[in-house]
């Protein structure tokens, strides 16, 4: 997004989206998306990948936007690996209020994980519904 486009969006009272009007800490960018460290990080290196086009749902991204986001996820992982050396990752998207979406502009979380950051990591993203998190193999 050019600085001219950013300024136009800042002046547009009909588009109050913080990802459109005031992206902070941008680390990587491509034609269709950018990445930045999460302002409310849950672990060291927690980042988000955000499409430049304002769209609320991951399921409404174009195929090209999905590819652009996935490319940045991989690039951002390399940056996080070099700086923080995590032991694993969770990648996730909240879509809709029932899933906890609070900003209605798609953003894909890249959450580095570290040995011992939780007592029992089994189930990973399944912990979004705590009673269903643990399972037997």
Residue ranges of each PLM-predicted region?
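HIT superfamily nucleotide-processing domains
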Residues: 1-137
């Amino acid at each position: 997004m050019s600085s001219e486009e950013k300024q136009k969006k800042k002046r547009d009272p009909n588009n109050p989206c913080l990802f459109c009007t005031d992206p902070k800490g941008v680390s990587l960018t491509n034609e269709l998306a950018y990445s930045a460290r999460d302002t409310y990080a849950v672990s060291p290196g927690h980042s988000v990948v955000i499409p430049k086009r304002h769209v609320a749902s991951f399921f409404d991204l174009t195929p090209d936007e999905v590819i652009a986001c996935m490319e940045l996820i991989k690039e951002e992982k390399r940056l996080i690996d070099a700086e923080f050396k995590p032991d694993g990752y969770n990648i996730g998207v909240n879509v809709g209020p029932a899933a906890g979406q609070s900003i209605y502009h798609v953003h894909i979380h890249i959450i580095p994980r570290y040995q011992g950051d939780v007592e029992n990591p089994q189930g990973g993203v399944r912990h979004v519904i705590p009673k269903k998190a643990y399972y037997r193999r």
